[in-house]
UniProtKB/Swiss-Prot annotation:
Protein name per UniProt: DNA mismatch repair protein MutL
Keyword entries, A-Z: DNA damage, DNA repair
Keyword Membrane: no
GO biological process: mismatch repair
UniProt cross-references to SMART domains, sorted A to Z: DNA_mis_repair, MutL_C
Ranges annotated as spanning the membrane: none
Described purpose of this protein according to its UniProt entry: This protein is involved in the repair of mismatches in DNA. It is required for dam-dependent methyl-directed DNA mismatch repair. May act as a 'molecular matchmaker', a protein that promotes the formation of a stable complex between two or more DNA-binding proteins in an ATP-dependent manner without itself being part of a final effector complex.
Organism field: Xylella fastidiosa (strain Temecula1 / ATCC 700964)
Length: 619
């Protein structure tokens, strides 16, 4: 077959195969265009889950009549004009591919009007064939109608799923968008019935977070707001005991754009590593903000993925921020919850939707949840921007100020004797009153009853003390009497050669002895009884994939957790009131004491009002 130039309609239909996967893809592209046009309200009307009709109506800036034919041409856009614009793009869309791709596989109508125009205009396209632009009555803003999606591409249409499934994809995308843009009013109707309405608000008013993710999520949320090295991470993560069976409540936004990023997800999972029950997943809504020039958003047809210029710095920043947030939690301390309505006053209000910007453009989500540690100074101070060449300096800024050690500021209560104090001075976990079946400690607190699993609690206390002790002496190495030869892939050998200093800091002395072989001369002393060969392979795999590894630290922590478990007080051991109170005070002063080393909860609170309801008091 000879080489030939494809017709424009076929080119657009091929492009539609990348951009328009299903009705949810159409809704995504059109609503993002509305947001880029400054809309504060978007109405989405669907019939047959978008297969029969998708109508998107917004109150944005609108377009002039003469711009309508341009809007449906490939690579025609108002958002970029040069390579510099592309490298610093802050809008959700920028390629100019969505409208022509959608119009080529549907019966397409575009209506728009600017506020300064006397009337609007309408343009109809069927199967890629443009009609005439004619005057049309229309409110300021834009309306796009997409009818009979894939009517001229039967092979694509037969791959669509059931109506309920396709509608579910649209609703899930709408939830993700509503989280990123709390000041946007979003209405979703299906077959003439209003199914979702997200009212405009902000994160402090908690309405949207509860509406989308539920009260349990909102009341277990820990606020995150951390800046440094030209980066900012804010949003919320939930306490470990709210973990999920599936990773279905994990939302990440980069400069307001919803994305999936394996490196960031890996960093969050590592931060939860020793407080999460096996097989469970954390839940979070996180917003990462950085200079648009430091992230490439033009790497995926649907813009679901991005590429960071310094992925290792991002990974470390996210890990330390989330890990630091979790480390601030103490047994008895209520979460810094989103949704309890405890933030008032003008100074507590988040900035407006146009506040976050690195290049003069609007930067998507810009709300603030406040610092994860209201009582301590920020861990890091931000700097304006960092180039790849300045990465070492960025790392120095990132690690310049270690997290505040609250342990040093809280006195250890060893006597366990109740203090002569008023109700306002009752400790968070109260005072012990009894032991239940030799397993649980019962304590009276200011507003009810505390129940503590004494083995789980003592296990966490011992574990954290062991970690601090080993952190203080550093990681010691043990030379091997006979060097160990390790056969690896050439790529892994390259990583070992380039990361020799990193491996040395982890306790491994490794030299390359051939294209695919390594000589291991020393290993971490604490892990000498483990399987150093398998551990080193895992370390090389992490360094290759993420540029960062915590395998040695995790292996060390696993060993220390086992030691702490064996050294913890056993069930059915009788404790005196003083011993129980000492354990409660240690819990209040120990990081992550809300969970044992295996991720199980260590305590529970029953309020007096809850207990009253058990006995129908006050009715």
């Amino acid at each position: 077959m000879p080489i030939r130039q494809l017709p424009e309609i076929l080119i657009n239909q091929i492009a539609a195969g990348e951009v328009v996967e299903r009705p949810a893809s159409v809704v995504k592209e059109l609503v993002e265009n509305a947001i880029d046009a400054g809309a504060t309200r978007v109405d989405i009307e669907l019939e047959a889950a978008g297969v029969r009709l998708i109508r998107i109506r917004d109150n944005g800036h609108g377009m002039a009549a003469q711009e309508l034919p341009l809007a449906v041409l490939r690579h025609a856009t108002s958002k970029i004009a040069s390579l510099d614009d592309l490298e610093a793009v802050a809008t959700l869309g920028f390629r100019g591919e969505a409208l022509p791709s959608i119009a080529s596989v549907s019966r397409f109508t575009l209506m728009s009007r600017r506020a300064t125009d006397e009337h609007g205009a309408v343009l109809q396209i069927e199967g890629g064939t443009l009609g005439e632009v004619i005057p049309h009555a229309h409110a300021p803003g834009t309306t796009v109608e997409v009818r009979e999606l894939f009517y001229n591409v039967p092979a694509r249409r037969k791959f669509l799923r059931a109506e309920r499934t396709e509608l579910g994809h649209i609703e899930e995308w709408a939830r993700s968008l509503a989280l990123a843009h709390p000041d946007l009013e979003l209405r979703l109707s299906h077959n003439g019935k209003l199914s979702r309405r997200y009212k405009p608000g902000d994160w402090y008013s908690d309405v949207r977070l509860i509406e989308i993710l539920g009260e349990d999520f909102a009341h277990q949320a820990l606020r995150v707001d951390h800046s440094g090295a030209g980066l900012r991470l804010h949003g919320c993560i939930v306490q470990p005991h709210y973990s999920r069976l599936n990773a279905d409540q994990q939302y990440l936004y980069v400069n307001g754009r919803p994305v999936r990023d394996r490196s960031v997800a890996h960093a969050v999972k590592q931060a939860y590593s020793d407080v999460l029950y096996q097989g469970r997943h954390p839940a979070y809504v996180l917003f990462l903000e950085l200079d648009p020039a430091r992230v490439d958003v033009n790497v995926h047809p649907a813009k679901h993925e991005v590429r960071f210029r310094d992925a290792r710095l991002i990974h470390d920043f996210v890990y330390r921020t989330v890990q630091g947030t979790l480390a601030q939690t103490r047994a008895g301390t209520p979460p810094l919850a989103v949704g309890v309505g405890d933030v008032e006053g003008e100074g507590a209000r988040p900035p407006g939707r146009h506040a976050v910007s690195f290049s003069g453009r609007r930067g998507g989500a810009s709300h603030v949840l406040g610092s994860y540690s209201a009582s301590t100074a920020p861990l890091m101070q931000g700097v304006p921007s960092v180039s790849v060449a300045d990465a070492p300096a960025a790392y120095a800024a990132l690690y310049a100020a270690p997290p505040t050690q609250v342990m040093d500021a809280v006195p250890q209560m060893q006597t366990g004797l109740p203090l002569a104090a008023g109700a306002g001075d009752v400790p968070l976990l109260g005072y012990a009153i009894a032991q239940l079946h030799g397993i649980y400690i019962l304590a009276e607190c200011a507003d009810g009853l505390i129940v503590v699993d004494m083995h789980a609690a003592h296990e966490r206390i011992g574990y954290e003390r062991l970690k601090r002790a080993h952190d203080g002496i550093g990681l010691r190495t043990q030379p091997l009497l006979v060097p160990m030869t390790l056969m690896v892939a050439e790529r892994e050998a390259d990583v070992a050669e380039c990361e020799a200093e990193t491996l040395a800091n982890l306790g491994f002395e490794v030299t390359r002895s051939g294209p695919g072989s390594l000589q291991v001369r020393s290993i971490p002393a604490l892990l000498s009884q483990a399987e150093p060969e398998m551990l080193l392979r895992d370390v090389l795999s992490d360094l290759s994939e993420h540029g960062h590894t915590r395998r040695v630290a995790e292996a060390r922590d696993t060993l220390l957790a086992t030691m702490a478990c064996h050294g913890a007080v056993r069930a059915h051991r009788r404790l005196s009131i003083s011993e129980m109170n000492a354990l409660l005070r240690d819990m209040e002063a120990t990081e992550r004491s809300g969970q044992c080393n295996h991720g199980r909860p260590t305590w529970a609170r029953f309020s007096l009002a809850e207990i009253d309801r058990w006995f129908l008091r006050g009715r």
